[in-house]
């Protein structure tokens, strides 16, 4: 540290560098109901005390900079500064600490996830005093939550729009994700919806490419939806991806979807950005469209255990920004997640009030007040044999999305959809009869095969499929 030097022209101002912990480490601080609270996993550089590292995070993500400045005297730092108020070691990890930081609410623009993240994680992750930094959780106070619209509609309104109750919803991502013409794409949509699915879906990178422009896709998918609805008597939907290179183009696509009368559109909220996502969510609420959210790019941010951001933070941010569905892992299949941790952020998406529970990765009690809930979407390498586990784990307020598990059926797309619908109905009936899906799942599926040759064929194809890869990190 360089020495502090008092200038002749000042009284009380000392130029130079001082330790962050002298100002920003305040273990005596009592948090306020209006504070935004953050739990950071901090890995300091060798020789940096955890108190200094935690204080540095609080400083660099709020009012601090690397040196004392004249203009500190023109405001009240005690009112606006972030505070590291508690530090605890991470069990089983060397030189890792959970540092809790409290931010005054006045630091953040109302109704802006963009500003919230710019402040809390925008700059501090490149700080030299830290080897690694991960934002594990945020507590969003009700006073700040009430400045957001949140999901366009929420779980109950979606069920009322679809007139579907008492079971999970079924979906399918159209494959191959790229390369189909708009007409062939629409054909696949029709076959899946006609077979019994509630939704089909554009993949995250289906936007408006030379082989299939967005307007053509929207038209053929709308035709497929209306034809399937007429033949089944059920309300159907296809997640029309409105993600685009500009907000203006995105809204233009959403407007066209509304004019076609379809029930739902889609957005890639991380690659598209929170400003674009909130803009689209507001449009969807005002115009009666449901909004499906894909989390493309999330693993770039959340996969490393000691650096980045946990998905529960991204999930909370999405609930603030707005979305009626979001992909949330499966616990089974090719994109597995730890069961308790996954269910922790699933509850944060759906429930009005979630208690602190460190065993489930929930660092803070979260009260969502009246903000609508978000339906979690389970997708990625799942098939009919997973249906009992998925029904038990995710419950009714979920979307179970089978891409290859529908389109990979040996008899075609529609039989694949039939197989999934029969498997789901069998699991829901068994659950309602009091049977244990975890213990009797395979038996329940085999019994249903007697009444559905489509399900029997699917069970035969996928009976040996597992996604088991040795962990290398």
Curated annotation (Swiss-Prot):
GO biological process: photorespiration; reductive pentose-phosphate cycle
UniProt keyword list: Acetylation, Calvin cycle, Carbon dioxide fixation, Chloroplast, Disulfide bond, Lyase, Magnesium, Metal-binding, Methylation, Monooxygenase, Oxidoreductase, Photorespiration, Photosynthesis, Plastid
Binding site for substrate: 123, 173, 177, 295, 327, 379
Catalytic activity: 2 (2R)-3-phosphoglycerate + 2 H(+) = D-ribulose 1,5-bisphosphate + CO2 + H2O; D-ribulose 1,5-bisphosphate + O2 = 2-phosphoglycolate + (2R)-3-phosphoglycerate + 2 H(+)
N6,N6,N6-trimethyllysine PTM positions: 14
Active-site residue list: 175 (proton acceptor), 294 (proton acceptor)
Signal peptide: none
Processing and modification events after translation: The disulfide bond which can form in the large chain dimeric partners within the hexadecamer appears to be associated with oxidative stress and protein turnover.
Residues annotated as site: Transition state stabilizer: 334
InterPro entries attached to this UniProt entry: RuBisCO, RuBisCo_large_chain_AS, RuBisCO_lsu_C, RuBisCO_lsu_C_sf, RuBisCO_lsu_fd_N, RuBisCO_lsu_N_sf, RuBisCO_lsuI
Lyase recorded as keyword: yes
List of residues that carry N-acetylproline: 3
Cofactor descriptive note: Binds 1 Mg(2+) ion per subunit.
Family annotation (Pfam families): RuBisCO_large, RuBisCO_large_N
GO cellular component: chloroplast
Quaternary structure and partners: Heterohexadecamer of 8 large chains and 8 small chains; disulfide-linked. The disulfide link is formed within the large subunit homodimers.
Miscellaneous field: The basic functional RuBisCO is composed of a large chain homodimer in a 'head-to-tail' conformation. In form I RuBisCO this homodimer is arranged in a barrel-like tetramer with the small subunits forming a tetrameric 'cap' on each end of the 'barrel'.
Family named by the database record: Belongs to the RuBisCO large chain family. Type I subfamily.
Matches recorded under PANTHER family: RIBULOSE BISPHOSPHATE CARBOXYLASE, RIBULOSE BISPHOSPHATE CARBOXYLASE LARGE CHAIN
Summary of the function given for this chain in its UniProt record: RuBisCO catalyzes two reactions: the carboxylation of D-ribulose 1,5-bisphosphate, the primary event in carbon dioxide fixation, as well as the oxidative fragmentation of the pentose substrate in the photorespiration process. Both reactions occur simultaneously and in competition at the same active site.
Protein name: Ribulose bisphosphate carboxylase large chain
Organism, as annotated: Ajuga chamaepitys (Yellow bugle)
């Amino acid at each position: 540290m360089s020495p502090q030097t008092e200038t002749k022209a000042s009284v009380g101002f000392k130029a130079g560098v001082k330790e962050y912990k002298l100002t920003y480490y305040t273990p005596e601080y009592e948090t306020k109901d209006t504070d935004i609270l953050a739990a950071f996993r901090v890995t300091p550089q060798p020789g940096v005390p955890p108190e200094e590292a935690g204080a540095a995070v609080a400083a660099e993500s709020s009012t601090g900079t690397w040196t004392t400045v004249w203009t500190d005297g023109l405001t009240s730092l005690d009112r606006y500064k972030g505070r590291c108020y508690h530090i605890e070691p991470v069990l089983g990890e060397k030189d890792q600490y959970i540092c809790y930081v409290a931010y005054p609410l006045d630091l953040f623009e109302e109704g802006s996830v963009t500003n919230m993240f710019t402040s809390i994680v925008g700059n501090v992750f490149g700080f030299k005093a830290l080897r690694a930094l991960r934002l594990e959780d945020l507590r969003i106070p009700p006073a700040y939550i009430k400045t957001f619209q949140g999901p366009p509609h929420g779980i109950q309104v979606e069920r009322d729009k679809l007139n579907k109750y008492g079971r999970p919803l079924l979906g399918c991502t159209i494959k191959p994700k790229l390369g189909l013409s708009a007409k062939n794409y629409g054909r696949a949509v029709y076959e899946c919806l006609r077979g019994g699915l509630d939704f089909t879906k554009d993949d995250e990178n289906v936007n408006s490419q030379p082989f299939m422009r967005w307007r053509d896709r929207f038209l053929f998918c709308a035709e497929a939806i209306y034809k399937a609805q007429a033949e089944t008597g059920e309300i159907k939907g296809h997640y029309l991806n409105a993600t685009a290179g500009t907000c203006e183009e995105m809204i233009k696509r959403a407007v066209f979807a509304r004019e076609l009368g379809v029930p739902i559109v889609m957005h890639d909220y991380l690659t598209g950005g929170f400003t674009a996502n909130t803009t689209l969510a507001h449009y969807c609420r005002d115009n009666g469209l449901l909004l499906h959210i894909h989390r493309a790019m999330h693993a770039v941010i959340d996969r490393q255990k000691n650096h980045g951001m946990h998905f529960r933070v991204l999930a909370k941010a999405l609930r603030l920004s707005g979305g009626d569905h979001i992909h949330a892992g499966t616990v089974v299949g090719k994109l597995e997640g730890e069961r308790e941790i996954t269910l922790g952020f699933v509850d944060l998406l759906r429930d009005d009030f979630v208690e602190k529970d460190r065993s489930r990765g929930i660092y803070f009690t979260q009260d969502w007040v009246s903000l609508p809930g978000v339906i979690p979407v389970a997708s990625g390498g799942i098939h009919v044999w997973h249906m009992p586990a998925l029904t038990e784990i995710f419950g009714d307020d979920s979307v179970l999305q089978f891409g290859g598990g529908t389109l990979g059926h040996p008899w075609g797309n529609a039989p694949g959809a039939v197989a999934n619908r029969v498997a789901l109905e069998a699991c829901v009936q068994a659950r309602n009869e009091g049977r244990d899906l975890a213990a009797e799942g395979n038996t329940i599926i085999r019994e249903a095969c007697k009444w559905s040759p489509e399900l029997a064929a699917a069970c035969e194809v996928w009976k040996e499929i597992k996604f088991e890869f040795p962990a290398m990190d």
